[in-house]
């Protein structure tokens, strides 16, 4: 499990080539799913179109559980993109991993904290952007001092804590799952006895990790809509 990350330095920036590649793979898979599902639309959906419409309704219900649809409808595409992209990203590293020259190339991109924290920061920025856009700068800034002005430092801590927990929750669950799968794979390759002892736990953990991957995508999307509602709804 002591694999190195393939790094690329561009000026003062350092990129993990594996993470960049896997993000592109996840984006391509999501694009293909969306393209195949919508290329021949029918009044009575079947197959992939039925699957895509189910996702759309599922995300719509998430939004409506947090804010009225008139306000939250603008976040529908964001929610669909998030839940599909994160679910695919969570599952990419489960079937196998690819190591070349002691460098790990194939993994779940969400097992990298820079990815999950970037997603969380993106949600933070978007929530503030829409808060200012829909409420106005003065009104929105005033919400940080309600109900009392001394709440302002606590509101700042809350913003930081929400972003941190949103990103690290996703990272921790996916990274821990891949670590345990790697340990079980190492046990299975140690010999016949190790293989027999590891095969059942590995299959069970694979199934559980798939479940966790979908659940974490749902949780991230749900919390995104909770944070958005908190910023843009008048009753928050």
Swiss-Prot record:
Subunit structure: F-type ATPases have 2 components, CF(1) - the catalytic core - and CF(0) - the membrane proton channel. CF(1) has five subunits: alpha(3), beta(3), gamma(1), delta(1), epsilon(1). CF(0) has three main subunits: a(1), b(2) and c(9-12). The alpha and beta chains form an alternating ring which encloses part of the gamma chain. CF(1) is attached to CF(0) by a central stalk formed by the gamma and epsilon chains, while a peripheral stalk is formed by the delta and b chains.
Organism of this sequence: Lysinibacillus sphaericus (strain C3-41)
Chain ranges passing through the membrane: 18-38, 79-99, 112-132, 174-194, 205-227
Topology in the lipid bilayer: Multi-pass membrane protein
Gene: atpB
Annotated GO MF terms: proton-transporting ATP synthase activity, rotational mechanism
Protein's recorded name: ATP synthase subunit a
UniProt record, GO biological process: proton motive force-driven plasma membrane ATP synthesis
Pfam families: ATP-synt_A
PANTHER family assigned to the protein according to its UniProt record, in alphabetical order: ATP SYNTHASE SUBUNIT A, CHLOROPLASTIC
């Amino acid at each position: 499990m002591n694999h190195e990350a393939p790094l690329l330095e561009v000026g003062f920036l350092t990129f993990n080539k594996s993470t960049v590649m896997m993000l592109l793979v996840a984006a391509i898979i999501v694009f293909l799913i969306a393209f195949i599902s919508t290329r021949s639309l029918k009044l009575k959906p079947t197959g992939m179109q039925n699957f895509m419409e189910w996702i759309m309704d599922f995300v719509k219900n998430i939004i409506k559980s947090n804010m009225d649809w008139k306000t939250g409808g603008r976040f529908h595409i964001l929610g669909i993109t998030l839940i599909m992209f994160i679910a695919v990203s969570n599952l990419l590293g489960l079937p196998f991993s690819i190591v070349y020259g002691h460098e790990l190339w194939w993994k779940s991109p969400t097992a990298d904290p820079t990815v999950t924290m970037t997603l969380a920061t993106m949600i933070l920025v978007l929530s503030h952007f829409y808060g200012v856009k829909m409420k106005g700068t003065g009104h929105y800034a005033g919400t940080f001092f309600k109900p009392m002005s001394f709440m302002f430092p606590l509101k700042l801590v809350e913003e930081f804590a929400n972003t941190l927990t949103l990103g690290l929750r996703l990272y921790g669950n996916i990274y821990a799952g891949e670590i345990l799968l790697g340990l079980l794979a190492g046990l299975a390759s140690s010999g016949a006895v190790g293989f027999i002892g590891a095969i059942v736990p590995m299959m069970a953990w694979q199934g559980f990790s798939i479940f966790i991957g979908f659940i974490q995508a749902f949780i991230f999307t749900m919390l995104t809509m909770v944070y958005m509602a908190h910023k843009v709804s008048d009753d928050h």
